[in-house]
Every structure is written in C-alpha cells, then in structure tokens.
Swiss-Prot record:
This is Small integral membrane protein 15. Residues 53-74 are annotated as: Disordered. One of its GO terms (cellular component) is membrane. It comes from Danio rerio (Zebrafish). Belongs to the SMIM15 family. Pfam families: UPF0542 (PF15086).
Length: 74
C-alpha cells in the first residue's frame, strides 16, 4: 500500500532541493488542466449566450402574438 506520509516527505524534500525543477514539473502537469478548463468555460459561455438569445426570441414572438390578438379584438 502507498505510504502517503513518506510520499509527501519525498515531495517536500524534492521541492526544497530543486525548486525550479519542482515548479516546472508542477506547471507542466497543470497546463493541460488549465487549457481544458478554459475551453470548457468558453463553451459554457457560448451555450448560455445561445440560450439567452433563444429565450429573448421566444419572448418577442409571444409579445407579437399577444399584440396581434389584441389588435384583432379591437
């Protein structure tokens, strides 16, 4: 079984002995996650904008239908 305490001590020792190598490794490991996060955020923003446009379009249509019905009654 993996000894987490020993692994954590190894990582801390590695970071203390070679901080630039440690930071480089961490940044390289996290970069794909940052890219994925940015891509998913962008896609979500586009989906929300499309949904808002569709809702505004439906609301405008309903208002026009209601206006036309009122005009027919008069």
């Amino acid at each position: 079984m993996i000894d987490i305490k020993a692994w954590a001590e190894y990582v801390v020792e590695w970071a203390a002995k070679d901080p630039y190598g440690f930071l480089t490794t961490v940044i390289l490991a996290l970069t794909p996650l940052f890219i994925a996060s940015a891509l998913l955020s962008w896609k979500l923003a586009k989906m929300i904008e499309a949904k808002d446009r569709e809702q505004k379009k439906k609301q405008k249509r309903q208002e026009n239908i209601a206006k036309a019905k009122r005009a027919k009654k008069d």
